[in-house]
Amino acid sequence: MGSTGNAEIQIIPTHSSDEEANLFAMQLASAAVLPMALKAAIELDVLEIMAKSVPPSGYISPAEIAAQLPTTNPEAPVMLDRVLRLLASYSVVTYTLRELPSGKVERLYGLAPVCKFLTKNEDGVSLAPFLLTATDKVLLEPWFYLKDAILEGGIPFNKAYGMNEFDYHGTDHRFNKVFNKGMSSNSTITMKKILEMYNGFEGLTTIVDVGGGTGAVASMIVAKYPSINAINFDLPHVIQDAPAFSGVEHLGGDMFDGVPKGDAIFIKWICHDWSDEHCLKLLKNCYAALPDHGKVIVAEYILPPSPDPSIATKVVIHTDALMLAYNPGGKERTEKEFQALAMASGFRGFKVASCAFNTYVMEFLKTA
């Protein structure tokens, strides 16, 4: 045996940064555990149970949560503790330690600030359905084809399913409902903020929400501006699940063939699904459907020119990667790229009017 002074058996990094780099590499290698653990917690309604069972800044034990689940599994509290411990390490939930009479230390958990958006708000919506959409098996499969798409060309989603994402929705009713719920929930939260920040809907008579899903956004616009008549325009298999809303007409069709006429056309999170060529075709259809004083209101992320490590930038870059995996030419764009699309489509004016939860509201104006 060597002595403790023998340098050959000392485990000391050559540089302190080596330790950090190794840990970062290990974290990246296991990074998939976070969204999948959060997915399980959401599917089990763990966060909703916590929201209903404890006061703000309060705590609850895994055993108390497990008692409210439809399970007889004696290991459920221990398994929940391990899931919640993971979520606590990422500040999704908070924790405190409690010493039991036996001397054992028990972890108790509470809701962290992010849970405001992962549990139902006063409107009954949260971002939980959006997370369930993003982690659905249908949307995980294309990632296994990204390498092939880079080497051979094509779109990972198409390679996985033999068709584009939008056509696939019409073949899978389960996933179509999951997707619509996820998009509707996300839209409702973001749109509520947009309506607080942006006043460009004032004075309109008719607005067309292109790619409006099941009509949640159109209904919110009409609720704030009752004098507006709204047309919710999307593919037929999308609006088949759309509920009736006062002041909203659902129309099925293909936006690349044409769009309904209105004083203004609203397009939220649509351009990033498509290539520049597709966007130009859509925007030219919008231009033709508008009166001389009309405008297209575009709500999208704006891609920063540099990949800085801020959360806001990471969200945009994450979404750009999703577009790379799923959509035909879809991508996030810089402000200059949006302005170029507007000008190339015939619009004379362009401005960034507002921002809500990282979604920028831009106006493409027929007259400058």
From Swiss-Prot:
Binding-site residues, S-adenosyl-L-methionine: S187, G211, G212, D234, D254, M255, K268
Result of changing P142S: No effect on substrate preference
Documented effect of changing F144Y: No effect on substrate preference
Keyword annotations from UniProtKB, A to Z: Methyltransferase, S-adenosyl-L-methionine, Transferase
Tissue expression from the record: Expressed in petals, style and stamens, but not in stigma, sepals, leaves or stem tissues.
Keyword S-adenosyl-L-methionine found: yes
Catalytic activity, EC: 2.1.1.146
Pfam (any one): Dimerisation
One biological process term in Gene Ontology: methylation
Note in the entry: (iso)eugenol O-methyltransferase (IEMT) not only has distinct substrate specificity from Caffeic acid 3-O-methyltransferases (COMT), a highly homologous enzyme, but it also methylates the hydroxyl group at the para position rather than at the meta position as COMT does.
Protein name as it appears in the record: (Iso)eugenol O-methyltransferase
Naturally occurring in which organism (per UniProt): Clarkia breweri
